[in-house]
Amino acid sequence: MDKFRAIFIRRRHIRLYSCGRSQGRSSIPHDKANLPADMTSLTQRSSGLVQRRTEASRNAGDKDHLSGEEDHKPRRSEEQDGDDPGDAKETRLTLMEEVLLLGLKDREGYTSFWNDCISSGLRGCMLIELALRGRLQLEACGMRRKGLLARKVICKSDAPTGDVLLDEALKHIKDTQPPETVQSWIELLSGETWNPLKLHYQLRNVRERLAKNLVEKGVLTTEKQNFLLFDMTTHPLTNSNIKQRLIKKVQEAVLDKWVNDPHRMDKRLLALIFLAHSSDVLENAFAPLLDDQYDLAMKRVRQLLELEPEGESMKANTNELLWAVVAAFTK
């Protein structure tokens, strides 16, 4: 009897289950239908908890991302504020451009007609600029200890500098055999030679080409001025901030930041002082000074000019070609 009752109950369950599936009344999945009610509710609660935790973590991540972006925005703005285009342009000025800028009249846009030193001074700037960039050096002094002015200029690297004038001078020095001395190269690049076979070494229109470089860098502008019978291209100053920073740098080197030791000075700044003096434009940087400051500045410049280039070139951490150019102008 019990056996028949169990069979009857089983068949009834099967019939009810099949009817429920066929009519689509059962909304509980098959795997959850066999679970007790408390287990099903627990699963639903746990799944809801996981969803809430996932959503909370997403919201927190979004907030962190937004806050991170807000933190980066002021930093970017600070970096942009710190980037001064004037400073960037000043750092790109070569020694030749700095010397020419000191010699140019701000409004007129040309150098003094009576200045016959700036031409050779600019050629000396080219040699030092190439030496500071690792393109030129002096030959070894040897056992006999040749003097600076007797040693030849050697091409250390012929890699382009990106400056047309410097690359042109570098090509001349590289292709010339036998090599020439510093004094000879200053004369050859200036065209001051009696040998007609060496006139092709002369670099032409140097001041005009340097002025055009300064125009491209936003320091100068280009104008035409009429001088009685002919027109002349001039380059008046358009960005006075750069020139003022240059003048201030030269003044501070011999006043507030004077170190009384040329080897503790920046090599480029030291070369600028020497070559600006040799080009007869250094006093233009000292013109705004008071009388006491002017006297002190010129006194310290004279101290630099009285140095012995031969002895200074033998000291550690020095540039021999720089002192060779100084010797060529101060001999």
Question: Which role does the model predict for each range below?
Answer:
Residues 126-130, 134, 210, 214, ...:
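Short, structured motif recognition centered on aromatic/hydrophobic residues
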